[in-house]
Regions:
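Catalytic core of pol beta-like nucleotidyltransferases
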Residues: 1-22, 30-36, 45-95
Length: 95
């Protein structure tokens, strides 16, 4: 299993490959109050190939941790959107 920095770099590479606008880490890992086996929560915006991105995260990401991916271009609860806005850490943003 790769270090989290390497995992985040892989996520960035997948975002670039799938033409995403932005990827945001949220949840306990973004807040810094995670446990060692806590999952990785990421939100993706403007991803042209979201299905491919999800596939790469599920099948190719070098981690044994669970990864939850939400698509910010779909309808999400206001509570979740508020959490992402409050706690989110940008992992990738297209320039």
């Amino acid at each position: 299993m790769a270090s989290l920095d390497k995992v985040y770099k892989q996520i960035e590479d997948f975002a670039r490959e799938c033409d995403a606008e932005k990827v945001v880490l949220f949840g306990s890992r973004a807040r810094g109050n995670n446990l060692p086996k806590s999952d990785i929560d990421i939100a993706v915006a403007g991803c042209r190939y979201f299905g491919r991105f999800s596939y790469l995260i599920e099948e190719r990401l070098d981690t044994l941790l669970d990864v939850d991916v939400v698509n910010l271009d779909e309808s999400l609860s206001q509570q979740l959107l508020d959490e992402i806005a409050r706690d989110g850490v940008i992992l990738y943003e297209k320039i």
